[in-house]
């Protein structure tokens, strides 16, 4: 199982890097999604869900549909969420890209919040404590977290397996 997860994780990592190369102004979002999903399939995995590319005020989970005319903007905040699976073992990861200097600090805040979460996560730590680290980091950059998005547990064949990690110190998520 661990070997498969590492292999699929490598596919997701490479797929995200590939997606970053494709994110250019005026490129159709659907085209990027289709190319990234084809990349995943070409690397002996299957998409765990449709590639999500969310722009600006759309915080997450935007899925381009056939005929979608949405283009990557010249300036903006682009979030790319990719998941792949093999034999039901799922890996899910996302990255935030700043297009233009206006959004650079927000993208840095997102990355720093992820690093704070990873540095806080240890055996015995409660989910709310990770959320506290995330919220403090984001607020240090002058932003507020999105309260209705969370990290989530993944199980075999199950992308959202119940256990969540909030972006703020929600003690009900312990």
At which residue positions do the language-model features occur?
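Active-site neighborhoods and metal-handling regions in enzymes and metal-associated proteins
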Residues: 1-174
């Amino acid at each position: 199982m661990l070997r498969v997860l590492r292999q699929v994780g490598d596919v997701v990592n490479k797929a995200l890097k590939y997606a970053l190369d494709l994110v250019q102004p005026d490129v159709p979002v659907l085209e990027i999604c289709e190319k990234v999903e084809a990349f995943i399939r070409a690397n002996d995995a299957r998409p765990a869900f449709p590639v999500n590319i969310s722009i600006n005020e759309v915080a997450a989970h935007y899925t381009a549909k056939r005929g979608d005319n949405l283009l990557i903007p010249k300036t903006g905040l682009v979030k790319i969420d990719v998941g792949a699976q093999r034999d039901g073992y799922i890996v899910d990861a996302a990255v935030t890209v700043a297009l233009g200097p206006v959004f650079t600090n927000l993208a840095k805040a997102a990355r720093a919040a992820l690093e704070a979460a990873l540095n806080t996560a240890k055996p015995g730590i409660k989910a709310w404590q990770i959320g506290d680290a995330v919220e403090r980091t984001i607020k240090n950059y002058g932003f507020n977290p999105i309260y209705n998005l969370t990290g989530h547990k993944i199980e075999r064949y199950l992308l959202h397996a119940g256990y969540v990690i909030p972006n703020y110190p929600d003690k009900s998520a312990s």
